[in-house]
Amino acid sequence: MNDRLQGVQAADGAAVAAADIPKAVTAGRLVYADGATQVFTTDGQTTYSERGGDSAGEWYVDDHGRFCSFWPPSYRACYALRWLVEDTRIVGLRFTGLRDGVTFEGRYA
């Protein structure tokens, strides 16, 4: 298990509690199915990297306890965040867009 997630109780597919979102997203670099990667930092910044290019954005937990991101100049999106757990080990996160229902998974590298 990722050391930063020690003490977190998680089941596969369970919602990430609002209080655990910062710990969950900053626990390590996430790798997506298409090979893109993303890093979230504790100061609310994020960098998404794909095909040799980087995009800088921001992340936050909104007043409703949801994970949200902002990509300048104007794109905002909020997601339902769920744990990916295999053999009792937290291996990543599942994001589902609240606006469009699109789901994607990121695995800790």
What would you call each of these model-derived segments?
Residues M1-E58, D62-A109:
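Lipid interaction determinants
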